[in-house]
Each structure stands twice: as structure tokens, then as C-alpha cells.
Amino acid sequence: MVQGTTSDAGKSTLVAALCRVFANRGLNVAPFKPQNMALNSAVTDDGGEIGRAQALQAIAAKVAPETDFNPILLKPNSDTGAQVIIHGKAMSNMEAGAYHDYKKVAMDAVLTSHNRLAKRFDLLLVEGAGSPAEINLRANDIANMGYAEAVDCPVIIIADIDKGGVFAHLVGTLALLSESEQARVKGFVINRFRGDISLLQSGLDWLEQYTGKPVLGVLPYLHDLALDAEDAIAIDNTLTNASVNIAVLLVPHISNHTDFDALRLHPNININYVAHTQAIPDVDLTILPGSKNVLSDLAFLKNEGWDTQIKRHLRYGGKVLGICGGMQMLGNSINDPLGVESSLQQMPGLALSDFTSTLTAQKILSNVTATMQLNNQQILCSGYEIHAGISQGEALNKPFLSFNEHPNGFTADGFISDDNAIAGTYLHGLFDQASATLQILKWLKADTVINPVNINQHREQQLERLAAMCETHLNIAHIIKIYEGHNHERTK
């Protein structure tokens, strides 16, 4: 199990890297994260929902994503509450205090998934959450040492040296663990080091002597590493000579921002993430992204004055695309009579298209293939749906996508406006296909000659790059000994 001294220490990336290392060596390996909190999620083949990081780790392990890889997923929908997803299915919305009391039930789900996977795979590579040393969260912990103790799992702790204070982070984390938990820690990994490693050696020697734990590797800072991000959005990517300029509205509960990864990777496409207090710049396309709390984010959008700016953008020839919750915002109204996402029950939309949306208790989760209707062309594309809502209205008679087959029986999705300036879809992952991306770019500018990035090929290159780094800078032989020695002790 990989645990971290802090959030964003490198746990997800290290687990993905090790998944690829051991998969390349012929092991039947799977990722596992007992509990994840994230707004970026993925849909499994059986119609379940897991964290995006575990889907990436599954790709690294060369296996299909499945719900057991992430039995508990928490999707925040307010500052104090989240939707609780167990074994891929949404159970309910809970405030933090209520979920704390629910953890014993959640642990049963975690152990059920663990036991099923342990029977099928040679090796489970487990990712912790946050830090194991959060004193206020240690009671009934299911994400870090609580899980490790329950299943008797050895632990490696990773820390990010680029943030500073790496020795204090590692020693302090270890000191706050119980004796049995300290014994479970088999070594450290230092992440994102840049500079002369010889200047770090005295610190590494001291750390090993002081703690009695080996340093299993010092991973270098990998520049331009681009993999599916779970939480953070890299917004500093402004290009001065881009052929196409796109604005993405950074609403507070933005979800599945990995939709835009393929666009961000292209050297001739400029993505402007428009944040609080910022105006929408002069761009070719404004995107309203997915949201985990659509009504709240719609209110935020209006308070920012973006509704007026979007209409001005359209008057001056710009185009607008709404994805999932962003599409719902483009209609006449959004209704949430059951309080699926918030206490707000109804709000007028931007009224840029003639339809209404109603949030429902049943969440639609599916991987689909569709035909995109754009530029008088029919383009085959694929993606995934994650939404708790149904849209109805006149505008949907001119759909953006059509389905030959859909798990829920739908024949079409979204809309394209009569003036060809506004489009909406529930489909995530649209830009992951180069052919679909090219048609959307041609929708913006008919003379577009950009060759879009193949995101799947790029992802594979990055995973192999990570694996090669670990083979060089990690003591893989020692990690294998930890695993084999632990298994030997358990079978005595």
C-alpha cells in the first residue's frame, strides 16, 4: 500500500507506475483504493462509477476498470457534504458527521471488494488517501492505516520534496502512527526531486538511521508529465499564437475536467480556464463543463456576470458548448424536486435553448458509442455518461448525437441550435477521439487543419515513461522482497 505524507504527494502516480512496472513483468496486478474523494470519475463496463485515478491505474495494469477497484467514492456537492457511492452505485448524500458514523458499514464494502480482488489477482497495489497521520480522522479509518491493519498490508510512504520539508513530513508522519502501524511501514519514497542527488545523500542516510526504514527510491521531477488529473486543474497554459482559443468556465463544483486533457495537450489550441472574478476573454468557443451541483454552479455563473458575457460572445460570432450539467444550464430551467444535489429546487437557466432539465434519483452511468451530427457530417465517437437528470424540449428534436444502441434505450442526445452556434451533450470524453475533436474544431473554424492529439496513445506513452523512471530510480527488487516476505509471513 502506498500512503502519502500529504495530499498530492504522488500516491496515485506511483501506484499507476508500479501497476505498469509489474504488468510489464507479467504479473496479474490490480489497483485498489478503499476510499476516494473526487469529482472526476469514470464509468466501468458494468455501469458503475469509480475514481478517475483508479481507471487510469487499471489501464496501467492492463486490465479493465471495475467497481471493486474503488469501493467507496465520495463526490463532494457542498463544503460539508458529498454523494456517497458504494460499489459503483450512488447511495445517498451525507454530511461529513453522518458519514463518519457510517464508516463501519463502508468498511464492510471495502473488505468485500478487497477479498474478491485478492482471490483473482497476484498482487494488489493499494493507494491511500490524504495522510495516515490526520489525528481527527483516525477513528474508524478505512482509507489508510485502518484498512492496512484490517487486511495486514505492508505500507510505503511517499513524500513530495518539491514542496519542501520532506524530512519533517516523513519523520512527523511516522511519529504520529501507532507502534503496530510504524512496524507496517517498510520504507520511504521521495518524489519530484530536481538537482544533484549527491547533495541529498546525507539527508537520506540520516533518515534511514533515525527511522530504521530504508529509502526505496528518489524519483526525479518529470517535466511535462500529463496524465488524467484527479483533482487539480492546470490552468497556466496560455499560448500566444494558438490557432483556436477556447474558454472553460471554472465553476466551483466542476466535474470531469479531464474532458479537456486532449485539447490542453495540443500546441495550437489555447485553453483559458475562466475563474472567479475573471471575464470571459475573446475566444472561438466557450464551454460550460460538467458540474456536481448544477443549480449552485448556475447561480455562481450568473453572479459572475458570465450569463451576460456568454450572450455577448454569441452576438459577436462565438460558439458555446455545454457538457452534461453545462448543457442543462443552457436550457430554460433546471428542476431538482427531490433535492438530489442541493436544497435549491428550481432555477431559471440561461434560456439559450428551448428545453428543461429535471434531476432524478436514478443516475445514468454508461459507456456509449454514438454518431455526432455536425458540419453536415456524421462522425462515429464514443464516451461516457454520468448524470442524474433528464432533459426534454423542442430543442432536442435536433440532436447533437444519435445512438444505434444505448443501455437505457435512448436514441439521441443533446442538441445543436438552428443557427449552428450552440450545442449541448451529456457525453463526457468527447475530445478523446481525434475525429470528433477535428469536427468540433471545424465547427468553430471551417478551415481548421489541426491534427488533434490521440489521447489514448499519449496516455500509453506517459505510463511507459513512468514505468521506465521507476525501473531506474526505485529499488524494485526491494519492493518485491517486501511483498514476497510479507506473503511468506502470512502463510506460516
From Swiss-Prot:
It comes from Pseudoalteromonas translucida (strain TAC 125). SUPFAM superfamilies: Class I glutamine amidotransferase-like, P-loop containing nucleoside triphosphate hydrolases. This is Cobyric acid synthase. The lineage of its organism: Bacteria, Pseudomonadati, Pseudomonadota, Gammaproteobacteria, Alteromonadales. Belongs to the CobB/CobQ family. CobQ subfamily. The keyword Transmembrane does not apply. Pathway: Cofactor biosynthesis; adenosylcobalamin biosynthesis. Residues 243-436 form the GATase cobBQ-type domain. Pfam families: CbiA, GATase_3. The gene is cobQ.
